Amino acid sequence: MLIRDCMTRHPILAPLSLRASEAQALMAENNIRHLPIVGDGKRLTGLITRERLAVKADMLGSLNVWEISRFLSDQRVRDLMVKGKDVITITPDRTVERAAAMMTEHKIGCLPVVEEGDLVVGIVTENDLLRSYQEMLGLPSAGVRVTVRMPNRHGEFVRLMAVLVEQNWGVMGIGTFPTRRDPTTYDAVIKIPNVTIEEVQAALSSIPNQLIVDIRAAV
């Protein structure tokens, strides 16, 4: 899946002149945590987050509620935002796994999606990536979810798929990943529609050297 397939299109954008208090209200009203800041032609100039707008704890002790309100009213997003050169971005043709790796590496919760000239065309957040992961594994449709552990060698996954073909079963979602703490094996998670747990158990248990480590009805 590519970023263009999972990003939020036409995200809410804000100008440099927006007051911090207005940015807080805009984010609360739209239930968002990240707000790209743009200049002329929707070109990215920065990024503001709820964390950036939060008043620091050491300041709370010296200001009363009216002073805090006045402080936020005087502040503009351009004074608080992550500056354009420091904003980590991604393009629509990159993969979702690359976006996940970038967000993990930089410990950030979103990536503005830009095209040539830093033109903002979308935004991808942690929620977007989690939604994509759910779709890859067949949510929200019902089916039997089975995890099969197999040796990490050529041909094992083909043998698993051959059984599914032989049974004429469809696949709603699939994912593979190395087994934790055991580099000699890996797990395949498959969601199969219109079957029973007993049918899947019987068919897949016949594959030599492959082990069903989890099986359940799932939605």
Say what each PLM segment does.
Residues 18-25, 97-101:
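Short, basic/aromatic recognition patches
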Residues 178-186, 216-219:
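Short proline/glycine- and acidic-rich turn/helix-capping motifs at secondary-structure junctions
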Residues 1-10, 50-91, 97-104, 116, ...:
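Tandem CBS (Bateman) regulatory domains
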Residues 186-193:
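A generic structural motif
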Residues 33, 109, 170, 210-211:
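Residue-level detector of anion-binding/catalytic polar loops
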Residues 25-31, 102-106:
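Short loop/turn motifs at secondary-structure junctions and domain boundaries
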Residues 14-15, 33-50, 90-91, 109-123:
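Cytosolic beta-strand hydrophobic patch enriched in CBS
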Residues 199, 205-219:
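Short, charged, intrinsically disordered terminal tails
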